[in-house]
Amino acid sequence: MVLKRDYEKKEVVKAVAEMWAPLTQAEKRVLLQDIHIKSFKKNHFIYKSSDLPTRMMVLIQGKIKIYKWGRNGRSQIIRAIKPMEFFGFRAYFANELYKTEAMALENAVVAFFNTDTIVKLMKENFHISLFFLRYLSKELGQSDDRTVNLTQKHIRGRLAEALLLLKNNFGSEEEDDTLSIHLSREDLASLSNMTTSNAIRTLSNFANENLRCSS
């Protein structure tokens, strides 16, 4: 009899192996032995700032926000994670403690791999190293774009960019074209680098003007 948890682990390893392909059967067995799957309720932390990064994570189900606190006591959402995206590994490769925090935006399931195990596989399999090199490069490019948008665009432009980012990453519901991610007004303001009151007012203006998200 195969336990449900074992089945989930095998399915996750299979999905990860497809992204890192080609992997040998021995490498897949290493991942299967190392993987740990954990469920998180909405608003629960996956990791906190100043924690020691010892595990690499991939989101299996749900949505997660990565954010950082500023000097003014306001949080800034760096990005939102969707299923089958990796996170929580940059600090390890930079030999740093976590500078950000990760919290579940809704009930979520996360798979964990020990970073030492992944690094060992990276040394043995060039395709895994190349995957993360491309992954980090893509994130860096997106971060550059976000920096320009948040520092040079006006309030309406910043909020519009945030809404388009969410739609492109998470999609929208077919019946009414609403976003397939539910953010609080505070989180949307944080993603757009503005106060909550400005976000509410700008959203109201968008609604009154009957504006729609289209990428």
Go through each PLM region and give its residues.
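Cyclic nucleotide-binding regulatory module and flanking cytosolic helices
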Residues: 1-42, 86, 91-93
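Cyclic nucleotide-binding regulatory domains
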Residues: 19, 44-106
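Cyclic-nucleotide recognition modules
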Residues: 27-28, 79-141
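Short loop/turn motifs at secondary-structure junctions and domain boundaries
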Residues: 29-30, 46-50, 173
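Short helix-to-loop capping/linker segments positioned immediately adjacent to catalytic or ligand/cofactor-binding
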Residues: 119-123, 142-152, 170-174
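Short amphipathic alpha-helical elements of helix-turn-helix/winged-helix folds
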Residues: 162-166
